[in-house]
């Protein structure tokens, strides 16, 4: 097939760049322009030079996108929008995250799955596809980063935003189902860029305003697919591989190239292939990781109450309130959103493809994502990091290295399991985010074969860039892109919420009257 052949050629180009970069890093300066620049930079490698330039670009972007409207309170505007939006949706829909929880589980179990409904994947596959993009390194590395930067108190805010984020995700995924486009061949186009454009026009907004909302979201979604959905995953996967084979920095190019090739093998199959892969990977890797975490918590059961007290004290103590309270809150919210993506609209792209003729039903399935991702897995990881004392250990490293240290302190053999989990988490996240970014790319440039091949080639190239970049720059870029998706999505979601509320009231009435057909 032309697509497979072209993707192979693109990968070959990336592979060639990897080998070239690797050889450059291994050799002494030979007088060429790249080598000369490296020599003048005090012996910096090519990868270090690229990382330095990347850091400068990220710095300029952060100054614009993380603007703080109130100088005396250092809270970025986007964090305020996410927090206020999540609280609004929860109250507006009558705490649906609580009263609709059991029904959401029944739907996910397949009780209402009609194989003849329009769509490409089942409710369960839609959930696992979305979870594969969220249950991942945000849970393993992101939690450690939050505690490292914001202290144990950041965990409280991760849980809070996870609970409120459940209803935010319900709103956006319901809208994705309402405004999706089902093509004659059965494929689906859906997500915030579509419901923002169409829905806002139906609310009376001018075409250009509605189109601008969709365009802005699509641009940031593509950036998010390259950042948090790609570079961060590749960076931490590379770190995990280093932990297994030794600190061989010169192999980063090679590791990045191999990861790019493996991701390319799956993404050529689209959402159906992604759904088939994630429905097998996600339950397995979640089970392994949660089981290991529970073993450690049982072994440290006596320290759990003290850890819980420390988390609360770090969040509400007077010195925290008047000192670092805002910083703790911001770090907790940023890491929670990076982990569960509630409010940013990414999961709506996957849930739009689910087989159903009831938009509210898929929205309820989507609610389970933030609960599983943040309230359960992130909290467990945080407790492991705290009870082990890893966040206070100077030699524990950062990100996934800190989590590895925390697990290894109790289970000496666990780093091997964690490294495998990291690779699986990173891999599943990258293949899901490639689909998100590809749909946004198609919204901007069309769905021609050439446009799709170009996006996939760029996506694979960013895997290599993530493998050689520093964690600091990767996290900053990832936060910028993913959090910025919330600007148009939350604002548009609030405007369109009355439509969702009307659909929910109708659905809930029919559910209580036992009007739905079951298939269990």
Q: Where are these predicted regions, by residue range?
A:
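Flexible loop linkers connecting adjacent transmembrane helices
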Residues: 95-123, 145-147, 151-155, 167-208, ...
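Extracellular loop-to-transmembrane helix junctions
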Residues: 71-99, 148-187, 373-380, 479-492
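Membrane-interface loop-to-helix entry segments
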Residues: 81-84, 89-105, 213, 217, ...
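Helix-loop-helix module between adjacent transmembrane segments
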Residues: 89-90, 131-132, 161-188, 197-235, ...
């Amino acid at each position: 097939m032309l697509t497979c052949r072209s993707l192979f050629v693109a990968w070959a180009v990336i592979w060639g760049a990897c080998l070239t970069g690797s050889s450059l890093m291994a050799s002494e300066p030979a007088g060429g322009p790249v080598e000369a620049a490296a020599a003048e930079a005090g012996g910096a490698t090519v990868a270090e030079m690229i990382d330095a330039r990347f850091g400068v670009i990220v710095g300029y972007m952060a100054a614009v996108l993380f603007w703080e409207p109130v100088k005396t309170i250092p809270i970025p505007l986007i964090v305020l929008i996410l927090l206020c939006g999540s609280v609004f949706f929860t109250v507006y829909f009558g705490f649906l995250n609580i009263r609709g929880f059991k029904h959401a589980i029944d739907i996910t179990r397949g009780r209402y799955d009609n194989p003849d409904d329009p769509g490409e994947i089942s409710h369960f596959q839609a959930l696992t596809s979305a979870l594969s993009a969220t249950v991942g390194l945000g849970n393993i590395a992101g939690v450690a980063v939050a505690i490292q930067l914001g202290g144990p108190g950041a965990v409280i805010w991760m849980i809070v935003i996870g609970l409120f984020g459940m209803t935010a995700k319900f709103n956006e995924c319901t809208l994705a189902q309402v405004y999706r486009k089902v093509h004659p061949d059965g494929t689906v186009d859906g997500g915030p860029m579509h419901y923002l454009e169409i829905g806002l026009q139906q609310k009376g907004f001018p075409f250009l305003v509605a189109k601008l909302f969709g365009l802005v979201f699509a641009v940031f979604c593509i950036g998010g697919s390259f950042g948090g959905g790609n570079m961060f995953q590749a960076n931490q996967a590379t770190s995990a591989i280093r932990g297994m084979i030794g600190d061989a920095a010169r192999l980063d190019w090679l590791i990045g190239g191999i990861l790019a090739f493996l991701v390319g093998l799956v993404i050529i199959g689209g959402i159906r292939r992604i759904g088939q892969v994630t429905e097998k990977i996600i339950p397995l890797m979640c089970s392994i990781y949660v089981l290991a975490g529970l073993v450690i918590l049982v072994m440290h059961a006596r320290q759990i109450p003290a850890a819980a007290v420390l988390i609360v004290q770090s969040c509400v103590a007077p010195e925290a309130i008047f000192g670092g309270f805002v910083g703790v809150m911001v770090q907790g919210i940023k890491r929670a959103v990076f982990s569960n993506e509630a409010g940013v609209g990414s999961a709506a792209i996957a849930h739009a493809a689910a087989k159903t003729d009831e938009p509210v039903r898929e929205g309820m399935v989507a609610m389970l994502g933030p609960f599983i991702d943040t309230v359960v897995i992130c909290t467990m990881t945080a407790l492991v990091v705290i009870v082990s004392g890893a966040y206070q250990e100077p030699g524990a490293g950062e990100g996934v290295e800190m989590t590895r240290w925390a697990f290894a302190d109790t289970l000496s053999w666990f780093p091997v399991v964690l490294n495998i989990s990291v690779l699986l988490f990173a891999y599943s996240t990258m293949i899901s985010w490639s689909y998100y970014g590809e749909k946004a790319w198609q919204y901007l440039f069309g769905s021609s074969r050439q446009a799709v091949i170009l996006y996939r080639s760029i996506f694979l190239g960013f895997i290599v860039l993530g493998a050689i970049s520093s964690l600091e720059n990767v996290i900053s870029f990832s936060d910028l892109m993913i959090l910025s998706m919330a600007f148009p999505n939350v604002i548009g979601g609030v405007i369109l919420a009355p439509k969702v509320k009307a659909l929910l009231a109708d659905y809930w009435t029919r559910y209580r009257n036992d009007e739905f057909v079951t298939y269990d």
